Amino acid sequence: MKSKNGLSNARFWILVWGLGIAGQICWNMENQWFNTFVYAKIAKDPTIISWMVGVSATATTISTFLFGCISDRIGKRKVMASVGYILWGIFTIVFGLTQYLVRGSTETSSVLMAVGVAVVAADAIMSFFGSMGNDIGFNAWVNDHMKDSNKGQIGAALATQPVIGTIVGTVAGGMLVGSNDNYMR
């Protein structure tokens, strides 16, 4: 059965669950494991992590206001979600590649500063596009498809996804971190 916008019911729910779970797992991995990555692969300096948290929170807030307004004006939620998720994925990979900026050691303050800035910038850009894809694009798109007959089902799906994302992110992330002594120094 197709809705008034031409989206089949099955396709709608596949998108709600697929994109929703993907977004929640990504946010969980970022919030739970990226500080471990920085501490183990970049430097045992909590200042970098503090800067990551502050700058990425600012970037996410700016993204939310900027792309939220743009999305409301032009109404292209699918475009926002698609572009945001793709760029989010690319910059998540870029963030992981920052470990290769450390060539041997970060014992000199100038090297540590340069690598720290690169890590913070990669995290902020990644979070910026994550907010564009998930918070602005996906959540607004789901809201556009909400009506009285499906509002409870959508609410239940969206409420369940962070729990599933946290469980999967914690278990899968823990297995990856623990395998082959990835983060043990």
PLM feature segments, named:
Residues 65-72, 140, 173-175:
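Small-residue-mediated transmembrane helix hinge/kink sites in multi-pass secondary transporters
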Residues 2-60:
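Helix-loop boundary and gating motifs at the non-cytosolic
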Residues 49-71, 90-91, 164-167:
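Central cavity-lining transmembrane alpha-helices of secondary-active solute carriers
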Residues 123-160:
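Cytoplasmic helix-loop-helix junction between adjacent transmembrane helices
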Residues 59-61, 152-177:
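Glycine-rich segments within core transmembrane alpha-helices of 12-TM secondary carriers
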Residues 83-113:
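C-terminal ends and interior cores of transmembrane alpha-helices
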